[in-house]
Amino acid sequence: MGGCGSADSWVEAAPAQGWPAQYGDAANSSYTTTNGATNLTLRWTRSVKGSLAAGPALSARGYLALNGQTPAGCSLMEWQNDNNGRQRWCVRLVQGGGFAGPLFDGFDNLYVGQPGAIISFPPTQWTRWRQPVIGMPSTPRFLGHGRLLVSTHLGQLLVFDTRRGMVVGSPVDLVDGIDPTDATRGLADCAPARPGCPVAAAPAFSSVNGTVVVSVWQPGEPAAKLVGLKYHAEQLVREWTSDAVSAGVLASPVLSADGSTVYVNGRDHRLWALNAADGKAKWSAPLGFLAQTPPALTPHGLIVSGGGPDTALAAFRDAGDHAEGAWRRDDVTALSTASLAGTGVGYTVISGPNHDGTPGLSLLVFDPANGHTVNSYPLPGATGYPVGVSVGNDRRVVTATSDGQVYSFAP
């Protein structure tokens, strides 16, 4: 039995080498080491025949997964990104959790929540395992060593063994007085981040130091606060609660590459940096707009502001006790979180050009060093708002809208 040591770590589930989930990685950095393409061609478009509130997940093999909300028929879909969006399989999940996206592992298994359960699917549509949880899981996160972090909108945090689907350690409940039998309570408040949904956004995790950060809007409190936990020896332990952002935080937090700093939007129209060890404020910088999606972050410390209506596109550098403005584009309205690919390419979805009397949407390719436009590609017939940009390890770029339209570009 001595031969059964840690050499079998390759069989443990880990994030796919693509864009495994919304915001790219467990830290929510929206960054990939893949060098992004600047010249793209629109290869295919397709509709989920419903709505979307989370971005596409991309596996290393070119599979694409979407958690749609549809009036009938399939809602969770897996398509072939490199084959004109051809459907591989689809199933119908319990509806109401569209704000949470699926997660791919390196074996093309999928992990996704529905109200009251977390489910894993193999590369075919048959269920690998399904386990009950209290509430609706947000986009899951890998913790390393085949462990999965599941955080629900009602404040339950659990760690699962991805192979067997069993809970490891003890769950942590961040919100008191929750009815465990009502998995859908407050779900309608999650996408707009209103107080009825205590945990409206996915947590951030750093594998460097085991830090988990999640935003929690406790019942009866005026605003959402950040809560910090440590994952150690297969157990989550609550470490701190921060009210540094007194106006409340909005959207998922983002952890720096070294796990030392949390970046988050404030409802006070500022970008905040907090110490990940204790939740104390390091600095805040005025954005001049309300960012409704998380910032993006390179390993070298460039921070690109989140998106939303009436925004600009702005970048900062963390100078320790203050932020230095890197550049700002007031001429574009960034509607989604930027996705940063390698050293020299960023993507976001912006408003315009106008089309048939509607505002229209375009995929903007920009240089993160200075914000300059490299290319711009209109999204034909796009309506609603964008739900993010995903960058595959084959350099294909996929974006989608809240009205269920999916656009796939190739270099």
From Swiss-Prot:
InterPro entries: PQQ_rpt_dom, Quinoprotein_ADH-like_sf, WD40/YVTN_repeat-like_dom_sf
Coiled coil: none
A Pfam short name: PQQ_2
Protein name as annotated: Protein Rv3035
Organism per entry: Mycobacterium tuberculosis (strain ATCC 25618 / H37Rv)
Source organism phylogeny: Bacteria, Bacillati, Actinomycetota, Actinomycetes, Mycobacteriales
